[in-house]
Amino acid sequence: PYAHQQIARQMEDGTVTKRYCAFVYGSPPHPEGEVNAPIGRLPGHPRLRAVVPDGAPSLTRYAVTTRYGCGACKLSVSLATGRTHQIRVHMQFLGCPLIGDPDYVGDPAVFAPLARELAGVIDRQALHASYLAFRHPVTGERMELTAPLPDDMRRLERELTRLSQSRDM
């Protein structure tokens, strides 16, 4: 209980650092940026969220790590706030929905051709918690944990590279 309370307190204080790897359709307008847009429930859909005027303040930072010529990007994403579905909602709002996300897909007509080419490569949203840093609840030592991309996301990365190279020819 004590350790859990200490880590929960760090999360509330915003002293836990989390980074995610995301593969998105399209390309953000800038190599680095942030989405500062309030998130709340999507009217008529109790489990979904959206950028809404009366939503909770929400801030997501992103950096493009790879641009694929086939119409996708790999991003490093971090959260200044922790809203439900925040990355998914903010990426859709930015016009770059997560690959494989059935709920926050954006304009299907825009991304349908690439989505068809990626069918069967990944069967979930292409989002992975890759880095976590916090203070050990007992010793106070800074802990940094990293997690490599899972197999399905590495497969996606290879396929995006292959599709991009085939378009360059």
What does each model-found stretch correspond to?
Residues 1-169:
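RNA pseudouridine synthases
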